[in-house]
Design a protein with these regions (language model features):
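Positively charged n-region of N-terminal signal peptides that target proteins for export
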Residues: 1-4
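Bacterial N-terminal signal peptides
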Residues: 8-17
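Short glycine/proline- and aromatic-enriched beta-strand/turn motifs that initiate or cap beta-hairpins
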Residues: 22-68, 224-226
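Gram-negative (and chloroplast) outer-membrane scaffold detector with strong preference
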Residues: 24-28, 32-37, 70-147, 181, ...
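Residues that define the transmembrane beta-barrel architecture of outer-membrane proteins
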Residues: 34-36, 57-63, 104-110, 123, ...
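Flexible, solvent-exposed coil segments and beta strand-coil junctions
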Residues: 43-49, 86-96, 146-156, 195-201
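Extracellular loop and loop/strand-boundary signature of outer-membrane beta-barrel proteins
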Residues: 50-55, 95-101, 155-161, 202-207
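Predominantly the C-terminal beta-signal and adjacent terminal strand-loop region
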Residues: 82, 166, 171, 178-226
Length: 226
């Protein structure tokens, strides 16, 4: 009877040992568990336009706010989808202080990003990269000193958006800090290069290029659902 009891205890010990090994990866780290995160983010976005012929500009300052969903696919890699409302545009530079012009462009954006990260024992450093698509919802302009502007400037200011769809490539680095077991806060830098134009690109058009570059800084909050 004692031998049977010892054998039963030995089998139980082996099963527990196998279970504990199943909870670890080959290198001794805890096994990876896929997770689903939801969150919100906001920040400052700056933008400039590449015009041909060129236009002297200051950096245009805008903002970004939105929601995001992140799914951890495997250790070190996730898929992230965002829905953002953001203001971009351009601000022109003139020598005369009484002359100014800026245009605001409001977009609804949908970035689809690969999220690559390195776990540093709680804190993480990461890199996001992928395509950005969006649709322009509205545009507005502010100007002073119109009578002092040249004919080319006035012509440009009369142009409205011909192509409201935005598409481009972008991403950026960031750092993620845990707030307990299910929450994280992140600081992220971002750069987006637009591949399309807002004005007509026909040969007879005033500007054959009118593409956008965006760059900025956001703060992200994420909560793990599972």
């Amino acid at each position: 009877m004692k031998r049977i009891s010892l054998l039963a205890l030995s089998l139980l010990g082996c099963l527990l040992g196998v279970g504990s090994l199943g909870a670890q990866s080959v290198d001794g780290r805890p096994s990876f568990r896929q997770g689903l995160w939801i969150g919100a983010h906001g920040g400052v976005m700056a933008s400039r336009f590449g015009f041909t012929p060129s236009v002297r500009q200051h950096t245009h300052l805008g903002y970004l706010g939105g929601l995001q969903v992140r799914y951890d696919i495997e250790r070190g890699a996730s898929l992230q989808v965002e829905v953002n409302y953001q203001r971009t545009g351009w601000r022109e530079r003139y020598d005369a202080s009484e002359v100014s012009y800026s245009r605001d462009l409001d977009y609804l954006d949908l970035p689809i990003l690969t999220h690559l990260y390195l776990d540093l024992g709680g804190a993480k450093v990461f890199l996001n990269a992928g395509p950005f698509v969006g649709y322009q919802l509205r545009e507005s302009a502010q100007l002073t000193g119109k009578s002092l502007m040249g004919a080319q400037d006035k012509l440009r200011h009369e142009l409205t958006t011909r192509y409201p769809f935005f598409w481009g490539l972008g991403g950026g680095p960031g750092i993620s800090i845990p707030l307990g077991r299910r929450q994280r806060i992140e600081l992220e830098g971002r750069f987006v290069y637009g591949l399309g134009n807002i004005f007509s690109t026909e040969r007879t058009s005033a500007y054959v290029q009118s593409s956008e570059m965006r760059f900025g800084l956001t703060m992200n909050y994420l909560f793990r659902l599972r």
